[in-house]
Amino acid sequence: MATPYVTDESGKYIAATQRPDGSWRKQRKVKEGYVPQEEVPVYENKYVKFFKSKPSLPPGLSETDASTGKTQQPSKPDADTTLSKTAKRNMKRKEKRKQEKGEREQVEDARQDLERVNISETPVQKNLTSAHKNGSASSDNPAAEKAKKIKNLRKKLRQVEELQQKIDSGEIKEPSKEQLEKLSRRKALEEEIEDLELDL
């Protein structure tokens, strides 16, 4: 919209105009060379100008051809003929992986089905397997086993004695339930150590 200018002997004026709501704007005096805001060209950087000056159609295509749409698309060749050797190889690998994944899933499903079916062992078999384990462990070196057990029991006895000393010295004022249970096992530990030492 062009701004309506009025000129007289006193200078140049922007004429009074009516607003959309019906009120009137005053006429304003304008200096020489003044350009109203609406008429100032919008700044465009060089990239915007470049893209505006660029044709919208690809090179070699006229506007008449584009508007009628008479240009024919070249027929696409088969995907297999355009793929390179490595692309074909990769396609084969992907297909192979898909097949293997499907097979793996089937095997996994079958395995889960087998796990759901509980095959119960008979008590005789359980006893035989546990006896076999115990027999093989004890047949290796019974003296070494007993020595190891004595060592562990002495360690426990030492811990009980240290706990008793802490209680007697007042370091532990109120022993916990577990500590009291540990103290009560002292006699049983001593008896077990004596029995094992006699067997050696």
UniProtKB/Swiss-Prot annotation:
The keyword Cell membrane is assigned to this record: no
GO molecular function, one term: ribosome binding
Locations listed in the record: Cytoplasm; Nucleus, Nucleolus; Nucleus, Nucleoplasm
Entry annotated with the keyword Transmembrane: no
Residue span of region Disordered: 1-30, 52-147
Biased composition (Polar residues): 64-85, 119-141
Entry-linked InterPro entries: PYM1 (IPR039333), WIBG_mago-bd (IPR015362), WIBG_N_sf (IPR036348)
Entry's Gene Ontology cellular component terms: cytoplasm; exon-exon junction complex; nucleolus; nucleoplasm
Chief location of this protein within or outside the cell: cytoplasm
Top-level lineage group: Eukaryota
Keywords, comma-separated and alphabetical: Coiled coil, Cytoplasm, Nonsense-mediated mRNA decay, Nucleus, Translation regulation
Comp. bias (Basic and acidic residues): 97-118
Residue ranges that the Swiss-Prot or TrEMBL entry lists as coiled coil: 84-200
Any GO BP annotation: positive regulation of translation
Residue ranges with Basic residues bias: 86-96
Described function: Key regulator of the exon junction complex (EJC), a multiprotein complex that associates immediately upstream of the exon-exon junction on mRNAs and serves as a positional landmark for the intron exon structure of genes and directs post-transcriptional processes in the cytoplasm such as mRNA export, nonsense-mediated mRNA decay (NMD) or translation. Acts as an EJC disassembly factor, allowing translation-dependent EJC removal and recycling by disrupting mature EJC from spliced mRNAs.
Self-association and partners: Interacts (via N-terminus) with magoh and rbm8a; the interaction is direct. Associates (eIF2A-like region) with the 40S ribosomal subunit and the 48S preinitiation complex.
Family: Belongs to the pym family.
The protein, known as: Partner of Y14 and mago
Biological source species: Xenopus tropicalis
